[in-house]
């Protein structure tokens, strides 16, 4: 079973934190709250719906950190004229992502901004 103040869904435990932290600090905080804890990973529409039902009553219309980071750096990119992508000028600021507490939209945010967040861990055995 999940800890008493966490919610259970599909083999995972979840908790909304009404604390504002940077992405790094929120991820670290989640690892300290529960064994195997991390920022929430949203892998299905059902999981997003569950997160919204959990987070909206606490945070109202807001944004929460999710466990997705550096997505664009992992994409295969190329120039329209098929030239090799040899010169790169990415900013040093990694891209982190937030989810809305009202629908299934995600947005990029600078990782050093403080946001609310949702932690997730596996149900303890």
From Swiss-Prot:
Keyword Disulfide bond: yes
Subcellular location(s) of the protein: Secreted
SMART domains with a match to the protein in the record: CLECT (SM00034)
Main localization of the protein described in the UniProt heading: secreted
Keywords: Disulfide bond, Glycoprotein, Hemostasis impairing toxin, Secreted, Toxin
Tissue occurrence: Expressed by the venom gland.
GO molecular function, one term: toxin activity
Function (record text): Interferes with one step of hemostasis (modulation of platelet aggregation, or coagulation cascade, for example).
UniProt record similarity statement: Belongs to the snaclec family.
Descriptive protein name: Snaclec B7
């Amino acid at each position: 079973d999940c800890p008493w103040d966490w919610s259970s869904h599909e083999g995972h435990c979840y908790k909304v934190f009404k604390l504002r932290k940077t992405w790094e600090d929120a991820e670290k905080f989640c690892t300290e709250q529960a064994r195997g804890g991390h920022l929430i990973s949203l892998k299905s529409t059902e999981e997003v719906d569950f997160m919204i039902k959990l987070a909206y009553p606490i945070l109202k219309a807001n944004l929460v950190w999710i466990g997705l980071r550096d997505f664009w750096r992992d994409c295969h990119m190329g120039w329209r004229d098929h030239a090799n992508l040899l010169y790169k000028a990415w900013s040093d600021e990694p891209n982190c992502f937030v989810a809305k507490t009202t629908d299934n939209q995600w947005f990029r945010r600078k990782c050093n901004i403080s946001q609310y967040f949702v932690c997730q861990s596996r149900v303890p055995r």
